[in-house]
Amino acid sequence: MNITAGKYNGRKVIAPDENITRPTLSKVRMALFNTLQSLIDFEGASFLDMFAGSGIMGLEAISRGFEKVVAIEKNPKIFKVLENNYKSLGERQTLIKGDSLKSMPQEFFDVIYIEPPNYAGVYEEALSVIGECKIIILEHTTEIDLTGFELIKQKKYGDKYLTFLHK
């Protein structure tokens, strides 16, 4: 897996065991950040990756100009891969080993990205625990109850949807 744009363009990111995680495909990452770029200024912005896995989404955010990234990962083996990926790029960001639904930082984020492992059916719960933010991005394959959220944009890539919301 490689970072697709920005200061780390082309740099390799190690993916954990694919039986446990499903890293976001490069074409979907590119589309996500291209859409996001039309919505906010990345410079000085903050990005929360709730179910970080390898960390590719947060690393893409840093590479493209986000100043602050917080990545949360529950699985200890995957967290080690996440740490190593950040270290390999010399990035010092906030990495939290814990359950995203219980370890949510209570601070403002410009962007919150939610893609639970194996689409674990926790979207509604994740949406209920997030704090203030400008944009929420969901990557999902199933219908999600978005009551209480404003739909900004939704795009489909194969069987996956990228849904951009405002709280």
Residue ranges and their predicted role:
Residues M1-K167:
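Class I S-adenosyl-L-methionine-dependent methyltransferase catalytic core
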